[in-house]
Amino acid sequence: PIKSSAASDVYKRQDATIGKLGFGEKLLASGFQSVTTRTAGFATVSQAELTSASKLFGCILMFIGGSPGGTAGGIKTTTMAILLLTCAAVIRGRKSTECFGRRLAESNVRSGIAIVFLTFAIWLTGLFGLAVLEPDERFIDLMYEATSAIGTVGLSADLTPSLTRGSHVILMILMYVGRIGPITMALVFAGREDMQAKFRDLPEKRIMLG
């Protein structure tokens, strides 16, 4: 994607990874880096030498992942789009989430929010475990490894080989969850329906938010 490629180039401009490359080579390296973080796992530059800003930006791309219908990991681009569109609808005071002149199904919106929240909760739990087991490692590197695992990306900041067995177990669990978790959760939330809800209508209650 053009935007992510441009942002990646900005964050990596001072990196040792592409600092000596020509302008055209920098664009190619940045473009490939923004694409490979979606799930490809190939690296043309050293991930360990990326700056903290570049690694953080890479974590965002890895967490979002690619589009549905393929082998890409992450929460998927459509799920992230639903989340952003829902936020926009709330800000604009609209009752439903809209996109290109269509109203998105409420089941899609609820499933998308659930997928993002559950995936983030599992990722955060795994990252916390890594931080506890690896107190001497840089937190941004642990975050990069955890996000790459749950996003089934395959990139590494050259940290995984030196981790303890407990950390390896955490990363393996994140990989399994990332591979089957979001897809399975989407199918479960989309296909499961509470039969009792059809015959009851509970009173509405408003609570304070924010």
Descriptions of predicted regions:
Residues 8-210:
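Membrane-proximal intracellular helices of multi-pass ion channels
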Residues 1-7:
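Positively charged, low-complexity/disordered segments
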